[in-house]
Amino acid sequence: MKYDTSELCDIYQEDVNVVEPLFTNFGGRTSFGGQITTVKCFEDNGLLYDLLQENGHGRVLLVDGGGSVRRALIDAELGNLAVQNEWEGIVVYGAVRQVDDLEELDLGIQAMAATPAGAASEGIGESDTRVNFGGVTFFSGDHLYADNTGVILSKDALDLE
C-alpha cells in the first residue's frame, strides 16, 4: 500500500504526531507503514537480527540507535532478512550501510545517515520498550507511516480507505 504522509496529516491532524525531519529514505520502497516494534540498541545489531527473523507482515521495526552514525545498525544482510520475513519497513535513529544493496530491496528503510562501519552483534539492547527521538515518544503497538516527505505516528491504525 502507498502512503502519503502529507494527506494523512491533513485528514488526521489531531491524531498524529509528526517526527522531526531527521531521516532519509534508503530502501527500495518509498512509502511504508504498520504497527511498530520498538528496539533500543547502541552500535549493536544482534537484537535486530533476532527480531527480523519474526513474521513482519504489517509491522515496522523502529530502532533507537541513540542517534549514533559511527556504526551502521542495518546492512544488506539484515535488509534481506526483513524482506524474507515480510517486514514493511525499518526506521533507524542511527545509520545504515551497503546502501546500494538496500535500495534494491522491496522494503522501506529510513535512517539518519550511511556509514561503512558495521555494528557489533552481541545482542545488547532492549525490545518493546518506550523510546523517544525526533520530538515523539514511541511505544510498541503504535502505528507509523513514512514516505519521502516524512514520518508520522498514530496510537491507532489510520483508516486509509
From Swiss-Prot:
One of its GO terms (cellular component) is cytosol. The keyword Cytoplasm applies. InterPro entries: RraA, RraA/RraA-like, RraA/RraA-like_sf, RraA_gpbac. Pfam families: RraA-like (PF03737). One of its GO terms (biological process) is negative regulation of RNA catabolic process. GO terms for molecular function: endoribonuclease inhibitor activity; enzyme binding. Keywords: Cytoplasm. It is found in: Cytoplasm. It comes from the Bacteria. CDD domains: RraA_family. Globally modulates RNA abundance by binding to RNase E (Rne) and regulating its endonucleolytic activity. Can modulate Rne action in a substrate-dependent manner by altering the composition of the degradosome. Modulates RNA-binding and helicase activities of the degradosome. Belongs to the RraA family. Homotrimer. Binds to both RNA-binding sites in the C-terminal region of Rne and to RhlB. HAMAP family: RraA. This is Regulator of ribonuclease activity A. It comes from Sodalis glossinidius (strain morsitans).
